[in-house]
Swiss-Prot record:
Residues of the signal peptide: none
Name this protein carries in UniProt: Sugar-phosphatase AraL
pH dependence: Optimum pH is 7 with 4-nitrophenyl phosphate as substrate.
Sample GO molecular function, one term: sugar-phosphatase activity
Species of provenance: Bacillus subtilis (strain 168)
SUPFAM superfamilies (alphabetical): HAD-like
């Protein structure tokens, strides 16, 4: 059921950016009605890009998860902070060497982009920080050595937490804080939503401009902020980090119980 609309004027975005964690999935669980909502949008002729700040997975891993949930997609219709980070480094720092505080998905995207790995932390030009769910002291200490040795810091995102089956789990902000504090260094660039890098990558994947798009997500700080900053329509879902009634820095165009209510917006002629 639709909870709130900031206006009743019908909207007709050509492209839809759909956040994954907290919107389509909660951990590994598919949120009820998500698959059907995506099918509805496709029947309406909408272009769809799946978007996530999760920097510990690759697009291939993400596609496998979506296919396993019965959601067809192409790897080129997936935009992750890991893939956008890799593309940024390839474009602007193609001869630089990186050290990674992160998991295999990020390593895979950097390799696909042709980004060079440093052989040891102190040789790194950049330290790339991302979510690391099996983090060890040795991992953290090697990242510290890279930053203390002068490596510039780029983070896939700076989310404080992300939704999973058990509630919320610590995200990249915890890893960034540990390195910045211990190495007395500052992160130079955060790639993930709501950055223009993510918005541009998503719009480019669809061949559309930002004002032709709508974003659906569970986070005020990343999803709705990105929509508002770059002229997209936005729909907030309450199946993830945002809760009904909380104060919001950015006001979404729509607030929905769940992504499944996208179907209701279409039936009511609000989304056309």
């Amino acid at each position: 059921m639709r909870i709130m609309a900031s206006h009743d004027t019908p909207v007709s975005p050509a492209g839809i950016l759909i956040d994954l964690d907290g919107t389509v999935f909660r951990g590994n669980e598919l949120i009820e009605g998500a698959r059907e909502a995506i099918k509805t949008l496709r029947r309406m002729g909408k272009k769809i890009v799946f978007l996530s700040n999760r920097g510990n997975i690759s697009r291939a891993m993400c596609r496998k998860k979506l296919l396993g949930a019965g959601i067809e997609t192409d790897v080129n219709d997936i935009v992750l902070s890991s893939s956008v980070t890799a593309a940024f480094l390839k474009k602007h720092y193609r001869f630089s060497k990186v050290w990674v505080l992160g998991e295999q998905g990020l390593v895979d995207e950097l390799r696909l982009a042709g980004v060079q790995n440093a052989s040891e932390p102190k040789e790194a030009d950049w330290l790339v920080i991302s979510l690391h769910e099996t983090l060890t002291y040795d991992d953290l200490n090697q990242a510290f050595q890279a930053a203390a040795g002068g490596a510039r810091i780029i983070a896939t995102n700076k989310d404080r937490s992300f939704p999973n089956e058990d509630g919320n789990a610590i995200d990249v902000a915890g890893m960034i804080g540990a390195i910045e504090t211990s190495a007395q260094a500052k992160t130079e660039l955060v790639v993930g939503k709501p950055s223009w890098l993510m918005a541009e990558a998503a719009c480019t994947a669809m061949g559309l401009s930002a004002h032709e798009c709508m974003i659906i997500g569970d986070s005020i700080e990343s999803d709705i902020a990105m929509g508002k900053l770059y002229g997209m329509k936005s729909a907030l879902v309450l199946t993830g980090s945002a809760k009904q009634g909380e104060q919001r820095l950015y006001t979404p165009d729509y607030v929905l119980d769940s992504i499944k209510d996208v179907t209701k917006l279409a039936e009511e002629g609000i989304l056309i």
